[in-house]
Regions:
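Short, amphipathic C-terminal "tail helix"
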Residues: 355-391
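Glycine-rich phosphate/pyrophosphate-binding beta-alpha loops
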Residues: 140, 258-291, 368-370
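A glycine/threonine-rich phosphate-anchoring loop and its flanking beta-alpha core
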Residues: 113-216, 309, 313
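Gly/Pro-rich interdomain helix-loop hinge
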Residues: 282-356
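ATP/NTP phosphate-donor binding region
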Residues: 1-92, 346
Length: 391
């Protein structure tokens, strides 16, 4: 185990609840409460700005994330953002968007590094300097309340660039936003597939936190359980009434995502994230979908190897919500998720035969923070078997 993973396990805090949390009906109410003005930089997307902010006539500096490039944050995107938003041009950062915008705005609140690469490989210190207000517009990332900023970076081994890319999480309590504002109204513009991927992502966060063998606490478990309960009930509603039923449940979905974020801030995520990161880094599969691709297979792996541990409590919880027998809880959950969003096999995103060896090596090299938090241990062979099962 690496020293950083060991330090996470040694953390004796019962729960980490750093941001002050608000809930508003509209963005206009939030803007009035916080007196947004010309020294505020608002990082968002144009498709969010136009229906919710444009008509307010605010004097903020509105910046659209898409001008820096498509997809999830990368070294190049972050550097382009730094160049476009001079450090002395703002006093406060407002993040209005999904996980990518949350991750980017956490960096805007910190001292600028010498290089983005050095920042993510822990060769430049993280130092919080400016307030960040996080406003999620998806219901999955939970990033609005966590101490992690994820980016696709140039991969290296023993300090030497390999020529490939991977995803790394920058972890520091200094990047936790100062305030969080939950505004369910902002989720109305989210198309169905990104909605489903993000909600499944939140379920993964809650599940991995619940099954965390070393870092879970009684308090984090409360947030995990409530998040799983709300998300699965929401999925049942959609399954019964159709896709548009989600609009009746947006408050619950955005709140459940936040609860899951609180849970994994303390208890941590695990191999679903660890094994999905190279998938996102190499083939640019969106984070929630890449987690979903591996989630069911990893849960089956846990149940096969240690069915009577904490996963039994998980199955009992799922069985109660879904109204099935405990022994059928994981298959029934996987079937429900398939009805919410059909599962793509890895081959559909470009996964190759060579990746069955390359990906486990990358996971073992770069993702120990996540793999050491496994409910049941993995090795290179078991990781390869998971990828093959999902292929």
């Amino acid at each position: 185990m690496d020293a950083f993973s060991a330090s996470l396990m040694a953390d004796k805090r019962e729960i980490i609840f750093a941001p002050t949390v608000y809930k508003f009906q509209t963005f206009a109410q939030m803007a009035e409460e916080f007196k947004l003005g010309e020294r505020d930089v608002v990082l968002t997307n144009e498709f969010i700005y136009t229906p919710f902010m444009k008509e307010l006539g605010l004097k903020c500096n509105f910046v659209f994330q898409e001008k820096f490039g498509a997809g999830e944050p990368s070294e190049a995107m972050i550097q382009t953002m730094y160049d476009a938003i001079p450090y002395d041009s703002y006093d406060r950062v407002i993040a209005v968007g999904g996980g990518a915008i949350m991750d980017l705005c956490k960096l805007l609140g910190c001292k600028r590094p010498d290089t983005v690469h050095n920042l993510y490989f822990k060769r430049f210190p993280v130092q919080h300097e400016k307030d960040v207000i996080a406003i999620p517009t998806t219901c999955g990332t939970g990033s609005e309340c966590t101490n992690i900023s994820v980016a696709i970076v140039k991969d290296e081994k023993d300090g030497v660039l390999t020529g490939g890319e991977t995803k790394l999480g920058l972890v520091s309590d200094d990047i936790i936003p100062n305030k969080v504002c939950l505004i369910p109204d902002l989720l109305k513009t989210l198309p169905y597939k990104p909605f489903a991927c993000s909600a499944i992502d939140a379920l993964v966060h809650a599940t991995e936190s619940f099954l965390s063998p070393h870092r879970k606490t009684m308090t984090s478990e409360l947030f995990s359980e409530k998040a799983m309960d709300m998300i699965l009930k929401g999925f049942k509603l959609i399954d019964e009434k159709g896709k548009d039923a989600r609009f009746e449940y947006l408050d619950e979905f955005v709140t459940a995502s936040f609860y899951a974020g609180i849970a994994f801030l303390k208890a941590g995520c695990g191999p679903v994230h660890g094994m999905s990161f190279p998938l996102g880094g190499t083939y640019h599969v969106p984070h929630g979908e890449s987690n979903y691709m591996l989630f069911g297979a990893i849960m089956d792996y846990y149940d096969a190897h240690n069915p009577d541990g904490e996963i039994m409590k998980f199955k009992e919880l799922v069985a109660r919500i879904l109204g099935c027998e405990v022994k059928n809880a994981i298959p029934e959950m996987n079937a429900l998720l398939q009805r919410i969003l059909p599962l793509r096999p890895l081959r559909d995103c470009g996964f190759t035969e060579a990746d069955f060896k390359i990906f486990p090596q990358s996971v073992e090299t770069n993702q120990q923070r996540l793999m050491t938090n496994a409910y049941y241990p993995f090795d290179l062979e078991s990781e390869e078997a998971i990828y093959r099962k999902c292929y």
